Amino acid sequence: LAGGATINRFFNQEVIKAVWPIWLGYLPLGFAGGVLAQKVGLTPGETGLMSLLVFAGSGQFIALAMMGGGAASITSIVMTTFIVNLRHLLYSSTLASYLMEASKKYLGTFAQGITDETFAVNLNKFTEKESDWNADKALGVNVLAHACWIFSNVLGNIVGNVVSIDMAVVSYTLTAMFIGLWSFHFEHKLLIIVGVFSGFLALSLSSVLDHKLHIVVATLLAATVGCAAESWCIKK
């Protein structure tokens, strides 16, 4: 009974309800990642290990593409993946304010599961009015999302020889899912303005900044403008 109660803290109906939209996006994208890994020469076990250690869709796809090219060194792959995922620093620092009482062991486990989608879901749940969302439920979302990612990658690798996938369609799945996760924030005018500004800024910077640094820079600049605008509105 005690064990069941402990598990229920992390994996319950509320957590499942929060994470299922992520599953819908991760299944096709992870499957495509597994197919690509199979084409590069990775076994199902190696693909599963990579998905466990590199829980980042864009980072994993870029790493696989570089591995497939044959000319990239381990150092260049690691550094490129690190730069591409720098935005996770912003995500973790934002969520940290809701996890002030968590242990270092918890934070290490939680940080491994932060992605664009788990960040969006957890931040939305933490900021809901009269929310009872807590660190255990947030970790449950991360773990279940990560498990789905590993499963879909391994499955894609296993059947990679007999499946052909249109990567353009698959890549849009994640974009559509992320927009859906943030859709209920559209009632806040300032967030809409900042979001649109950030999008246009990212597009403008994409031609001059490599390795997706334009996303990090655009996010920081837009967030700064948003904070300044919010402070001005409050004072006014």
Which functions belong to the PLM regions below?
Residues 2-54, 65-81, 235-236:
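Helix-loop-helix hairpins and the membrane-proximal interhelical loops
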Residues 12-29, 42-56, 164-180, 184-191, ...:
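Helical membrane-embedded segments and adjacent short helical loop/helix-boundary regions
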Residues 55-59, 83-90, 176-182, 202-204, ...:
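Alpha-helical transmembrane segments and their membrane-interface exit regions
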Residues 90-98, 123-126, 180-187, 225-236:
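C-terminal ends of transmembrane helices
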